[in-house]
């Protein structure tokens, strides 16, 4: 399966005219996403305000990427798990069966943060819990008839490294 960079699908213009076979993005497109930022802390049922992006924004990026039916979405900075949440919702809406790979360092949340106060030992733990909640919520909603209804995920934890410290 070939990887297609988002840059090959990215469209940018304000005059509604396609260029070089690419679709046009209106200049006012981002206004709605800007408004979403005010409610982003509430998304996913997880209290984590630092760095969250709106699910709707990530779903729009998925559409622009022209994913194939069984596309793979990779996020090297998983954080609260917004990308996986968006993939689940997008699959439920359009019937595709995208999968996701999230990567997150074993980062400890700030002791003063809501995430730490709710008992999450790491950001990865928080992300996994969000995926459980998001999957359950997606399955409770209306789903595309062609979708396989797969909201499962696996966690691979790297326990130790064979890399020598170089600093």
Pin down the residues of each PLM region.
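Short non-domain terminal segments
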Residues: 8, 18, 75, 151-154, ...
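Class I S-adenosyl-L-methionine
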Residues: 1-72, 94, 107-110
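Conserved S-adenosyl-L-methionine
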Residues: 55-137
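Intrinsically disordered, low-complexity regions
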Residues: 3-5, 9, 102, 123, ...
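SAM-dependent methyltransferase catalytic region
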Residues: 113, 117-167
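Intrinsically disordered, low-complexity boundary segments flanking structured domains
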Residues: 11-20, 88-90, 136-145
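Hydrophobic/aromatic beta-strand patches that form the interior of the parallel beta-sheet core
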Residues: 30, 101-103, 156
